[in-house]
Design a protein with these regions (language model features):
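Metal-dependent active-site segment of extracytoplasmic phospho-/sulfohydrolases and closely related
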Residues: 254, 260-286
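Active-site lining segments that contact anionic ligands and/or coordinate catalytic metals
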Residues: 223-225, 267-269, 275, 292-295, ...
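Proline-centered loop/turn at the N-terminus of a beta-strand
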Residues: 13-15, 271, 296
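A structural signal for short secondary-structure junctions
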Residues: 220, 265-268, 289-293, 302, ...
Length: 379
C-alpha cells in the first residue's frame, strides 16, 4: 500500500513517519539532552509511563485523567454529531481493546466493545434474575415524584446511568449484529467476511472496527475514533523471528482493513495510525533489543499522501550524533504532538482549541498556521 493499493499506483495509501517520540520541547542536538538544558519526558524507557504519555500527550508526567482523543471529543462531539437529538446519545470514541486513557475526556467517555459487539450484562437476556433486576433499574428511572423523593440520590443516579448504558448497548448491538445491513450496494457482513484477514486474534478487533465505522449513520455519528491494541512487541529475546512474524500479521491485518474500507466506499473518510511507546536500541543484547526512545509510525488511508517517509531519518551510528547512549538510544526529531496535531486538524479540531487538546503543541508548531505540521496528509 506504500506504492499502491491492489496494484494501483494511484492509490498510495500508506506513509511512514520517521524518528517520532514523546517530547516536551524540541531537542536541538545530543549535547542539549546530555547537559540537561532542555526538559525531557518523565520516566523515559518505561513502558507504563510512555504508553500513558502517548495516550494523554502530557509527557511531563503530571497526574492527568484525560487523553488527547477524549479531549478532542469534549470539543467536537456535539458540534460534529448533530443528528444526535433529544435524549439520544452515543459516544464517538469506541475501544475494541478495553479501557484506554486516549479516549477518556472530561465529559465524553468511551464505548467499550468486543469482536462480537457491545458488552452485555451477564444474564441480561432471557428469563433470568439479572434481566428482572435490569427491568427494575429501568423502572426506577421513571418512578413517581413521591417515590423518588424517598430514594437515595446515589441509587437514582446509578440506576439512570446503568439504564442508559444498557440502552446504548442494545441500540449498538442491533446494528452491529445485523447480517443484512447494507452500505450502498455492499452487504457489510459479506465484505468483512471475504476480506483476507490473517488467522490471528487481532483480526477480530479489526473486523469490529470496520463494522463500527460502517454503521456510523445508524449510530448518528459523523466523527468516531476506534482504538485497537496489538501488544507483545517487547522483544528482549528472539527478536528476528518474533518481530518478523508480528509484522507479517500487522501487514495482512492492515491490508484487509483498508480493503474493506475501499469496498465500502469509506477509504477517504478514515485515517488509520499507529502509536507505540518507544523504539528499541540499535545494539543487540544478544538475542533481542532493549528499551529506547524514538521510533517510526505508520499512517494509512485515503486522506494520506502515500508513498512518503516524513520526518528526519536518524543516524544509525552507535554513539553517533543521534544516539544518547546505552547502546543506541535515538532521540526523536519529530514530536508526537506534531503527529497528533495533523490528525486533529483533519478531524475538525479548530486552531484555537488545539492547545486544550495538546498542551505542548505551541513548543513545536503554530496551530494557526496554514500548513500542516508534518505533511503526511494530502493538502
Amino acid at each position: 500500500m506504500f506504492n499502491g493499493m491492489g496494484g494501483n499506483p494511484l492509490k498510495k495509501r500508506v506513509s511512514l513517519l520517521a524518528n517520532v517520540g514523546t517530547l516536551i520541547a524540541p531537542i536541538p542536538n545530543k549535547a542539549a539532552y546530555l547537559n540537561g538544558s532542555v526538559p525531557v519526558p518523565k520516566a523515559l524507557f518505561s513502558h507504563r509511563d510512555q504508553i500513558e504519555q502517548w495516550q494523554t500527550s502530557v509527557p511531563q508526567g503530571m497526574q492527568i485523567l484525560t487523553g488527547w482523543g477524549g479531549r478532542a471529543a469534549d470539543i467536537i462531539h456535539n458540534a460534529a454529531n448533530t443528528e444526535q437529538t433529544g435524549t439520544y446519545y452515543m459516544p464517538m470514541n469506541f475501544s475494541v481493546a478495553g479501557n484506554s486513557a486516549f479516549q477518556i475526556g472530561a465529559s465524553q467517555g468511551q464505548f467499550v466493545i468486543t469482536g462480537a459487539g457491545a458488552l452485555a450484562f451477564s444474564g441480561s437476556t432471557g428469563d433470568s434474575a439479572i434481566l428482572k433486576a435490569k427491568d427494575k433499574i429501568i423502572s426506577d428511572t421513571v418512578a413517581s415524584p413521591v417515590e423518588e423523593h424517598y430514594r437515595n440520590l446515589f441509587h437514582r443516579t446509578h440506576a439512570r446511568i446503568t439504564a442508559n448504558s444498557m440502552a446504548r448497548g442494545e441500540d449498538f448491538q442491533q446494528h452491529f449484529s445485523n447480517p443484512d445491513l447494507m452500505l450502498g450496494t455492499e452487504n457489510i457482513a459479506d465484505v468483512i467476511r471475504d476480506a483476507p484477514f490473517p488467522n490471528h486474534w487481532i483480526s477480530a478487533q479489526f473486523r469490529a472496527a470496520v463494522k463500527t465505522i460502517a454503521i456510523r449513520e445508524q449510530l448518528k455519528l459523523r466523527r468516531q475514533t476506534v482504538f485497537i491494541d496489538f501488544g507483545g512487541w517487547d522483544h528482549h529475546a528472539e527478536l528476528l523471528q518474533n518481530h518478523g512474524n508480528m509484522l507479517a500479521v500487522l501487514d495482512s491485518a492492515l491490508y484487509a482493513f483498508q480493503q474493506c474500507l475501499e469496498t465500502l466506499g469509506l477509504a477517504n473518510d478514515v485515517i488509520t495510525f499507529t502509536a507505540s511507546d518507544f523504539g528499541r536500541t540499535l545494539r543487540s543484547n544478544g538475542q533481542g533489543t532493549d528499551h529506547a526512545w524514538s521510533g517510526h509510525q505508520i499512517v494509512m488511508g485515503g486522506p494520506v499522501a502515500g508513498g512518503q517517509i516524513r520526518g528526519t531519518y536518524p543516524s544509525l551510528v552507535i554513539d553517533g550524533a543521534d544516539d544518547i547512549g546505552r547502546g543506541g538510544r535515538i532521540f526523536p526529531k519529530l514530536s508526537a504532538d506534531e503527529y497528533f496535531c495533523e490528525l486533529l486538524r483533519w478531524f475538525g479540531v479548530a486552531p484555537g482549541d488545539m492547545a486544550t487538546v495538546l498542551p505542548n503543541i505551541g513548543n513545536f508548531y503554530d496551530p494557526g498556521s496554514s500548513t500542516n505540521p508534518v505533511g503526511f496528509l494530502k493538502p
